[in-house]
Curated annotation (Swiss-Prot):
It catalyses: Na(+)(in) = Na(+)(out). Residues 1-117, 168-178, 220-237, 408-505, 560-568, 610-626, 733-934, 991-998, 1041-1055, 1203-1250, 1306-1312, 1363-1377, 1505-1682 are cytoplasmic. This is Sodium channel protein type 7 subunit alpha. Sodium leak channel functioning as an osmosensor regulating sodium ion levels in various tissues and organs. While most sodium channels are voltage-gated, SCN7A is not and lets sodium flow through membrane along its concentration gradient. In glial cells of the central nervous system, senses body-fluid sodium levels and controls salt intake behavior as well as voluntary water intake through activation of nearby neurons to maintain appropriate sodium levels in the body. By mediating sodium influx into keratinocytes, also plays a role in skin barrier homeostasis. Gene3D superfamilies: 1.10.287.70, EF-hand, iswi atpase, Voltage-gated potassium channels. Chain C. InterPro entries: Ion_trans_dom, Na_channel_asu, Na_chnl_inactivation_gate, Na_trans_assoc_dom, VGCC_Ca_Na, Volt_channel_dom_sf. The sequence contains 4 internal repeats, each with 5 hydrophobic segments (S1, S2, S3, S5, S6) and one positively charged segment (S4). Segments S4 are probably the voltage-sensors and are characterized by a series of positively charged amino acids at every third position. The chain crosses the membrane at residues 118-137, 142-167, 179-196, 201-219, 238-259, 368-407, 506-521, 531-559, 569-586, 593-609, 627-655, 702-732, 935-953, 962-990, 999-1020, 1022-1040, 1056-1080, 1168-1202, 1251-1272, 1277-1305, 1313-1338, 1342-1362, 1378-1402, 1469-1504. Residues 339-366, 674-700, 1128-1154, 1421-1444 dip into the membrane without crossing it. Residues 820-834 have a biased composition (Polar residues). GO terms for biological process: cardiac muscle cell action potential involved in contraction; cellular homeostasis; osmosensory signaling pathway; response to bacterium; sodium ion homeostasis; sodium ion transmembrane transport.
Length: 1682
């Protein structure tokens, strides 16, 4: 009998151990083993380092076969491991390979040693990198074939080594068992065939060599495991991808029905009556309509002007008519003429790539009414899909993070135990070390103890001690001798004197002032700059270099060189000083101007005095280190995509370049060489891909370009989004990192405190007229401004303040711990946000209501709490937050205001006992009743909406509409008087103090002032600018509607704490802006040909002087680009366009072509300036965006915790409605229809209510959608007739369905909303089929019927009808819908205000660039169209370009605008910049919070699943399924249906089949007839999910009480047995039956063989079942609880 082998440490793998393992595995296969739950140990996976708990690795164990240390492989798999000298684990199959090579064969052992050797892996990695470098080269050297053959030989040798070491296929860990080896083998085979075959293969196959780049991934274990995680994420995203395709298909079909063929409508030149006869004759020629020169083109446009036949569509100029002719725009690739191109256009809209052009094209061709379609697709649908991807990825990331955390928790005890063992041996080791040292130093003893020297543990300890020393000992002696200056006493006195000066607080204050002044001097550089300014800046630079040099010298004297360079900030300061000195020395050397760029490093000196800056920089560096594998994987993918694109399309761009450029020159964006291909891939990842895809399809075709681009878009965006989530999580976990303790920050605080102390002293002395300031006052000043230490404050604290001081004893300890634990993860902690595991939504809302009542009753105490919870006495941001909270919350307490009315002390101290006093009190009470009356509030709300709505009529046509103008003037007067009256009533009711202490009333007061000023502005001509302040009137809406109040409060809470981080981000942008000024100032000027509007070639015009010399003959223009880097302000604006990817291509083109100041730009002469913009997008956009969103999410979670886990963007009423919404989402609210008694009707009822009938209807809907996809713009008459009859057939089928349901449901048919919807679809479909026969197909297009029928596809999203994955993905959106609607209301209000402001300021701007007939500010509707476009960050650069037309050469300031007195069409650049920048920031902030709301809903669901808590939703789902199994509401189901019922439930109550054993183990009570009660099943399933949870008893009691309330007449039947007992009885009966049969068999020998064959299997099965259920009974925890 063989013993079960157990691994003990590292044991050599021998033939004996091999036989032992084989016998053990064979035995476990034959026996009923108990180790089914055994899984591989994560720390012992292939490629990881062997943990140190397994001891040291002796020399004889390196590269030698060892017994597997993982119990899973040791007991279940026939494997062994091999370790290299780096302790890396390699696992091999122990079976013989190639039928002869056993693990002990010398050939196989040699190949294993080669394979595991670190040098072999390094050699392969170097070979791959060399191959990558040569694959990126366009012009290869002559010796390329030699190198390629050498690399091919290396890869072939590697494959042979792996084959001999691992085997080909059989067993675990074989060569072909690894997918990466499949890739490597396939690429090598392709390369051999292509290289040595005489045939010419397809060029595409030659690109297979680029797959070799991916070989970097398996050579790095971190990359390999990360790819596995991303593949797991992709699996979870499958449902999202399917739903995305579903919605894209629906919108594509709608687009086909609305816009098919419309984009071919163009303005065509049609001969007039007075034109010659020749032209009339030409129009009869069919080729005339195809000639492109007969179309109308706008100036500078490549494609003809689109038009439409609707009144709100684009109109043609005089002499042109709108006809359908020519091809579609954008080289024919933009259209809705077929399903494929419509899908392409919708995908482009969803990705929001260049949407403004498609948006304008459709509105020109079809009309502005279709703006609704774009709002739904570009904003709502795009937002929803992005939220889905982010939510699912966030869930996957958190699951992976939790999995790693659980693994580390399991392994931690082992490491702690090992650490204890090592710690116990420390004393003995130290004693032995001391003995050795004593013997070494003793002159008597020369021998050492051999047994001590041979101690392996002691040697290991000594090696660790040696490794801690960074430098050799002689370097420390050198530093002590030469770098520590303790010379003469005079030097020590001088050093002490310098130390006092340089370390004084005011010295640091002086230095920080110098740093700020230096930054200001850096920002003053501009172009053109006068000589005086240039001289001033140079002198300033010399002064600052001198100051920083003196600081360094004095600190070296005060601290010694050794102490000085021990501080990181001092090393950084010395680098800045050395750079400044080197720059001075090389100032006149040609080519050294780039040294000026390193001046930007001086800005980072602020981090020494700015803790937030310092901590964020540290968090950034730590995050990059932690995420190095993810960054490396992203770079590998970009490199591979660039090389693959270059190999696949490079030759096509060279051969077919004339297809995309009229001059047959390569465009800026192509893939002919590696660098341009790399830039193209980077542009795709930035979201700008459609224009380069058009060019690619022109030169290489659609079959290869579209798959390549889809691959880059999907995989690249997955990597970028995953990196973004990892950064957000990393920043969130780094927020507890404390700032480094430095004296400079403390000294700065002390200096500021002393200055304030002195100022207070002087003020007190002046005010009090005394000689001495009271000591208590001065002590208070010191206590406020002098803090202990800035280093103890975390990132989360520093993000909540603008000052550098922080009081550490202000916040409550409990709340702080809860917040810190919560913010460690993206998922809110359920222990904080959920107090009860069942019906958490209800309990939260109920508790919240109680809290609201308590807060209303104790308002004064709440204000005291606000003051106590202030995180810093000196923090301006915290003060602002507390004031906002007080003004917004305090003003809403009507009780507080009513108390103020009764007191009556704020409007005069009139005694209430006098007659006048009583009259005054009665007046105030009356006013209070009026303003508190609900009807008065509704009236004021209505007047507010009317006064806001009237602003929409004040457009450029108002002067032509005299009646409307007069009505609006009277309305303004009435509204003004009403609001003044309301203000006076509230003054009388509440008093001045109460009124002006409320923030909303202060806002109302400001709006009333605006009303008054606008009326005053109409009276005097010089006061007319006051009228434009009307745009502030809609702000009053905020104070009238609770939903907007809630959103504004939430935005203030989540946004104000980010100001400090926002300032840090601005500093990063400032660095890039100053760099841009140094690189590009004055270099964006170019000589423009006025006739063509294009730039002159540099070969014709070399510089500015040449251009000006041509100016005398022709009107040549030496113009500057509107977006430039001539100063820091322009640099910020240009960087904002790059950050929003609007106009960034134009800016980069100007930078790439720039040569020097006053030199004509040349095409791509400075191409590597792309690196500047790439670095800005990474370090100036991506990373700061991650930091900002991290802080916003942290504050979102903090305030959500304060509200008990409720959403901070919904009102109290909406929180109650939230429960109802969840109930609607989880259950079907319709009442069941009774089954008819008639047999025929009953049969039809059973048919239409069956699941099969529902499936058939869904299939019909899908087939009908597929039939619509066949339709095209240009198709044969036969196809049109066939599609007509197909639509008719579907209409008949849906009519039959409607008739069958009418027969089955009778009058109950119309009680179901979905049936009414289907009935209306049938009616409209029949009408749509019949109308064309009477009124013609022009008035009723055939697509109308198709769109009506398509509306039925919404059934796919129904709960319980469509796919379950759709419901799960729609759930978070629907649950967050109330909050989203509130936020959308605020967005609409912001758009309304900005639309009115735009009409007042930009209505008459010249139509150019982004301002055209569709997008302009002439009317309110057009302004809203523009602002919607800007809200999705599309095309605002073009609008700003048009507004920048303020010079006489660009616009006409005296132009007469018909119908109005306004003159000119010039813009106002400063107002335009403020307008667009502010709107972009506000809309970005609001939209980011929209994303956070939906993503947090996803994570809340994930949090509940993770913690195995059962919510009310889970129980609703349970009873919903129960209705299907118990339609008669008996509260019982048959035990035979229990298995199906458990499998039909949703997780976590779900039990997958086979589940009979688990159900029997639950030991459920059974009544007569083998029936089981609903409550018993629910309780048992709940206990199975929650286990031994401490909340179990409370949950059970709530379930029982809730069930009794819902079912007061419980049908009770006494249980007669249980499921476990019934199974035991059945097993016992089987055993008795088997014994009796055996007895009969022994007596009847003739029938033994036949009966034995029948019953033998039954005996074995019964025995196993009996053993299983005996074991289940012993182990069942639920049975013991019952």
């Amino acid at each position: 009998m063989l013993a079960s082998p157990e691994p003990k440490g590292l044991v050599p793998f021998t033939k004996e151990s091999f036989e032992l393992i084989k016998q053990h595995i064979a035995k476990t296969h034959n026996e009923d083993h108990e180790e089914e739950d055994l899984k591989p140990t994560p720390d012992l996976e292939v490629g990881k380092k062997l943990p140190f708990i397994y001891g040291n690795l002796s020399q004889g164990m390196v590269s030698e076969p060892l017994e597997d240390v993982d119990p899973y492989y040791y007991k279940k798999k026939n494997t062994f491991i091999v370790l290299n000298k780096n302790r890396t684990i390699f696992r091999f199959n122990a079976a013989s390979i190639l039928c002869t090579l056993s693990p002990f064969n010398c050939i196989r052992r040699t190949t294993i040693k080669v394979l595991v050797h670190p040098f072999f892996q390094l050699f392969i990695l170097i070979s791959v990198l060399i191959d990558c470098v040569f694959m990126s080269l366009t012009n290869l050297p002559k010796w390329r074939p030699v190198l390629e053959n050498t690399l091919l030989g290396i890869y072939t040798f590697e494959i042979l080594v792996k084959l001999f070491a691992r085997g080909v296929w059989a067993g675990s860990f074989s060569f072909l068992g690894d997918p990466w080896n499949w890739l490597d083998f396939s690429v090598t085979v392709f390369e051999v065939i292509i290289r040595y075959s005489p045939l010419d293969f397809i060029p595409t196959l030659q690109t297979a060599r680029t797959l070799r780049i991916l070989k970097i991934i398996p050579l790095n274990q971190g990359l390999k495991s990360l790819v596995g995680v991303l593949i797991h994420c992709l699996k979870q995203l499958i449902g999202v991808i399917i739903l995305t395709l579903f919605f894209l298909s629906i919108f594509s079909l709608i687009g086909m029905g609305l816009f098919m063929g419309n984009l071919k409508h163009k303005c065509f030149r049609w001969p007039q009556e007075n034109e010659n006869e020749t032209l009339h004759n030409r129009t009869g020629n069919p080729y005339y309509i195809r000639e492109t020169e007969n179309f109308y083109y706008l100036e500078g446009e490549r494609y003809a002007l689109l038009c439409g036949n609707r009144t709100d569509a684009g109109q043609c100029p005089e002499g042109y008519v709108c006809v359908k002719a020519g091809i579609n725009p954008d080289q024919g690739f933009t259209n809705f003429d077929s399903f494929g191109w419509a899908l392409f256009a919708l995908f482009r809209l969803m990705a929001q790539d260049y949407p403004e052009v498609l948006y304008h094209q459709i509105l020109y061709a079809s009309g502005k009414v279709y703006m609704i379609f774009f709002v739904v697709v570009s904003f709502l649908f795009s937002f929803y899909m992005a939220s889905l991807f982010l939510g699912i990825l966030a869930m996957a990331y958190e699951e992976e993070k939790q999995r790693v955390g659980e693994i580390s928790k399991k392994i931690e005890p082992k490491f702690q135990q090992t650490g204890k063992e090592l710690q116990e041996g420390n004393e003995t080791d130290e004693a032995k070390t001391i003995q050795i040292e004593m013997k070494k130093r003793s002159p008597i003893s020369t021998d050492t103890s051999l047994d001590v020297l041979e101690d392996a543990t002691l040697r290991h300890k000594e090696e660790l001690e040696k490794s801690k020393k960074i430098c050799p000992l002689y370097w420390y002696k050198f530093a002590k001798t030469f770098l520590i200056w303790n010379c003469s006493p005079c030097w020590l006195k001088l050093k002490e004197f310098v130390h006092r000066i340089i370390m004084a607080p005011f010295t640091d204050l002086f230095l920080i002032i110098c740093i700020i002044l230096n930054v200001c001097f850096l920002t003053l550089e501009h172009y053109p700059m006068s000589k005086q300014t240039n001289t001033l800046l140079n002198i300033g630079n010399l002064v600052f270099i001198g100051i920083f040099t003196a600081e360094m010298i004095f600190k070296i004297i005060a601290m010694h060189p050794y102490g000085y360079f021990q501080v990181g900030w001092n090393i950084f300061d010395s680098m800045i000083v050395f750079h400044g000195l080197i720059e001075l020395c090389l100032a006149n050397v040609a080519g050294m101007a780039l040294l000026r760029l390193f001046r930007m490093l001086r800005i980072f000196k602020l981090g020494k005095y700015w803790p937030t800056f310092q901590i964020l920089m540290w968090s950034l560096s730590n995050s990059w280190v932690a995420l190095k594998d993810l960054v490396l994987l992203l770079f590998t993918f970009i490199f591979f995509s660039a090389a693959f694109g270059m190999k696949l399309f490079g030759k096509n761009y060279e051969e077919f370049v004339c297809h995309i450029d009229k001059d047959c020159q390569l465009p800026r964006w192509h893939m002919h060489d590696f660098f341009h291909s790399f830039l193209n891939v980077f542009r795709i990842l930035c979201g700008e891909w459609v224009e380069t895809l058009w060019d690619c399809m022109e030169v290489a075709g659609q079959s290869w370009c579209i798959p390549f681009y889809l691959m880059v878009i999907l995989i690249g965006n997955l990597l970028v989004l995953y990196l973004f989530l990892a950064l957000v999580s990393s920043f969130s976990s780094c927020k507890d990192v404390t700032a480094e303790e430095n004296n400079e920050a403390k000294n700065l605080q002390l200096a500021v405190a002393r200055i304030k102390k002195g100022i207070n002293y002087v003020l007190l002395k002046i005010l009090c007229k005394t000689q001495n300031v009271p000591k208590d006052t001065m002590d208070h000043v010191n206590e406020v401004y002098v803090k202990e230490d800035i280093s103890d404050h975390t990132l989360s604290e520093l993000s909540n303040t603008q000052d550098f001081l922080k009081d550490k004893e202000k916040s409550s300890g409990t709340e702080k711990n809860a917040t810190e634990n919560e913010s460690q993860s993206l998922i809110p902690s359920p222990s904080v946000s959920e107090t009860v595991p069942i019906a958490s939504g209800e309990s939260d809302i109920e508790n919240l209501d109680n809290k609201e009542i308590q807060s209303k009753s104790g308002d004064g105490g709440s204000k005291e709490k606000i003051k106590q919870s202030s995180s810093s006495e000196c923090s301006t941001v915290d003060i602002a937050i507390s004031e906002e909270e007080e003004m917004f919350y305090g003003g809403e307490r009507s009780k507080h205001l009513k108390n103020g009315c009764r007191r009556g002390s704020s409007l005069g101290q009139i005694s209430g006992a006098s007659k006048k006093g009583k009259i005054w009190q009665n007046i105030r009470k009356t006013c209070c009743k009026i303003v508190e009356n609900n009807w008065f509030k509704c009236f004021i709300g209505l007047v507010t909406l009317l006064s806001t709505g009237t602003l929409a009529f004040e457009d450029i046509y108002m002067d032509q509409r005299k009646t409307i103008k007069i009505l609006l003037e009277y309305a303004d007067m009435i509204f003004t008087y009403i609001f003044i009256l309301e203000m006076l009533l509230k003054w009388m009711a509440y008093g001045f103090k109460a009124y002006f202490s409320n923030g909303w009333y202060r806002l109302d007061f400001v709006v009333v002032i605006v009303f008054c000023l606008s009326l005053i502005g109409k009276t005097r001509e010089e006061l007319k600018p006051l009228i434009s302040m009307k745009f502030l009137r809609p702000l009053r809406v905020l104070s009238q509607f609770e939903r907007m109040k809630v959103v504004v409060r939430a935005l203030i809470k989540t946004t104000l704490p980010t100001l400090n981080v926002f300032l840090v981000c601005l500093m990063i942008w400032l660095i890039f802006s100053i760099m841009g000024v140094d690189l590009f100032a004055g270099r964006f000027y170019e000589c423009i040909d006025p006739t063509s509007g294009e730039r002159f070639p540099s070969s014709e015009v070399m510089n500015k002087s040449r251009c000006e010399s041509l100016l005398f003959n022709e009107s040549m223009l030496w113009e500057n680009a509107k977006m430039n880097f001539d100063n820091v302000g322009n640099g910020f604006l240009s960087l904002l366009q790059v950050a929003t990817f609007n106009g960034w291509i134009t800016i980069m083109n100007s930078a790439i072509d720039s040569v020097a100041v006053n030199i004509q730009p040349h095409f791509e002469v400075n191409i590597y300036m792309y690196c500047y913009f790439i670095n800005f997008i990474i370090f100036g956009v991506f990373l700061p965006l991650s930091m900002l969103i991290t802080v916003i999410i942290d504050n979102f979670n903090k305030h959500k915790i304060k509200l008990g886990g409720s959403n901070i963007f919904i009102t109290v009423k909406q929180r109650k409605q939230y429960r109802r919404l969840k109930k609607l989402m989880y259950e079907d609210s319709q009442r069941p229809v009774p089954r008819p008694l008639n047999k025929l009707q009953g049969f039809i009822f059973d048919v239409v209510t069956s699941q099969a009938f529902n499936v058939i209807v869904m299939v019909l809907i899908c087939f009908q959608a597929i039939a619509m996809m066949i339709d095209t713009d240009v198709q044969s008459l036969q196809m049109s007739i066939a599609l007509y009859w197909i639509n008719s057939i579907f209409v008949m089928l849906y009519t039959m369905e409607c008739i069958l349901k009418l027969i089955a449901f009778r009058c109950f048919y119309f009680t179901i909303a979905w049936n009414i919807f289907d009935f209306m679809v049938v009616i409209f479909s029949i009408t749509g089929l019949c109308l064309p026969m009477t009124v013609g197909s022009y008035l009723v297009p055939p697509s109308l019927v198709q769109l009506i029928l398509l509306s039925r596809i919404i059934h796919m999203l129904r709960l319980g009808k469509g796919p379950k994955v759709f419901h799960n993905l729609m759930l978070p959106l629907m649950l967050s819908l109330p909050a989203l609607l509130n936020i959308i209301l605020l967005i609409f209000l912001v758009m309304f205000i900005y639309a009115v402001f735009g009409m007042y300021n930009f209505a008459y701007v010249k139509k150019e660039a982004g301002i055209n007939d569709v997008s302009n500010f002439e009317t309110f509707g057009n302004s809203m169209l523009c602002l919607f476009q800007v809200a999705i960050f599309a095309g605002w650069d073009g609008m700003l370009d048009a507004i920048f037309n303020s010079k006489w050469s660009d616009c006409d300031p005296d132009k007469i605008n018909p119908g109005t007195q306004v003159r000119g069409d010039c813009g106002n650049p400063s107002v335009g910049i403020f307008y667009f920048v502010s709107y972009i920031l506000i809309s970005w902030l609001i939209i980011v919070n929209m994303y956070i709301v939906v993503v947090m809903e996803f994570l809340n669901i994930a949090s509940k699943k993770k913690n195995k808590t059962l919510s009310e939703d889970d129980f609703r789902k349970f009873f919903q399924v129960w209705k299907r199994f118990d339609p008669d509401r008996t509260q019982y189901i048959d035990s035979s249906k229990l298995s199906d019922f458990a499998a039909a439930l949703d997780p976590p109550l779900f039990m997958a089949k086979p589940n009979k054993g688990q159900l029997i183990a639950l030991d459920l009570p059974m009544a007569v007839g083998d029936r089981i009660h609903c409550l018993d099943i629910l309780l048992a399933f709940t206990k199975r999910v929650m286990g031994q949870d401490v909340r179990m008893e409370k949950v059970v009691s709530e379930i029982e009480s809730g069930f009794l309330l819902a079912n007061p007449f419980k049908i009770t039947c006494e249980p007669i047995t249980t499921t476990l007992k019934r199974k035991q009885e059945a097993v016992s009966a089987t055993i008795i039956q088997r014994a009796y049969k055996n007895y009969r068999l022994r007596r009847n020998d003739k029938n033994t063989s036949d009966i034995h064959m029948i019953d033998g299997d039954r005996d074995v099965h019964a025995t196993k079942e009996g053993a299983y259920f005996d074991k289940a009974k012993e182990k069942s925890p639920i049975q013991s609880q019952i």
